């Protein structure tokens, strides 16, 4: 019995005892860069967790991650082997308790159209499985990569919850065009906006409120180590 349990743990079939974690479905070519960005983003947290569910062997995933990432800072990376569209597998990685879910696309943009369509369909099935796991409750925010314009629209309208579907080629093409037509400073702005080096943006609302109406000038004194920002509309 002990050996069977040990073998199950090695295969990555056991329950994940986490909540408020970042869940990644799939283990593609960009997984290392995604993990690195998440590690950097999590440095402000004392104990953060990334859980990865993929059909790859758990030991292989662990070795690839260890070989490519040296410093995990405050983030623990947990891998599990399983099918990303399987409801029982999603329950084992506590999908409904995640703070956000990233669904990786298994096909790179240069692959044949048939392969891209199959990969997009798998992403859509994964999203529907996440919705099923949550059983009527609001699901965690989902970010996914989908190649087809039609399937991206379908993904974002398949649920009332938050689903953001991106197309790698479209996003990069727009950024490259804007950089080519602008001055060099735009590249610095993009780096600051999408990276986690230096200052970051946080949305904050104290549990006890602000103690009454505040002007923007009055709010500045409430922050010791950060700078408040806001939006000034035409109505003031």
Predicted regions span which residues?
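Cytosolic regulatory regions of ion transport systems
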Residues: 1-236
């Amino acid at each position: 019995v002990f050996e069977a349990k040990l073998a199950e743990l090695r295969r990555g079939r056991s329950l994940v005892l986490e909540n408020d974690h970042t869940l990644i479905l799939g283990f593609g070519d960009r997984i290392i860069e995604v993990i690195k960005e998440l590690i950097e983003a999590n440095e402000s947290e004392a104990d953060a967790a990334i859980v990865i569910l993929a059909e790859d062997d758990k030991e292989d995933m662990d070795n690839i991650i260890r070989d490519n990432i040296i410093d995990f800072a405050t983030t623990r990376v947990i891998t599990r082997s399983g099918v990303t569209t399987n409801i029982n597998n999603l329950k084992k990685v506590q999908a409904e308790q995640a703070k956000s879910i990233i669904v990786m696309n298994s096909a790179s943009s240069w692959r044949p159209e048939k392969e891209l369509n199959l990969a997009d369909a798998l992403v859509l099935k994964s999203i529907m499985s996440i919705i099923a796991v949550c059983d009527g409750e609001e699901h965690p925010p989902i970010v996914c990569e989908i190649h087809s314009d039609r399937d991206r629209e379908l993904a974002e309208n398949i649920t009332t919850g938050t689903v953001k579907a991106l197309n790698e080629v479209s996003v990069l093409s727009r950024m490259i065009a804007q950089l080519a037509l602008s001055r060099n400073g735009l590249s610095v702005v993009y780096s600051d906006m999408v990276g986690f080096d230096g200052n970051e943006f946080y949305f904050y609302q104290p549990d006890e409120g602000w103690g009454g109406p505040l002007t923007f000038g009055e709010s500045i004194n409430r922050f010791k180590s950060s700078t408040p920002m806001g939006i000034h509309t035409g109505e003031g």
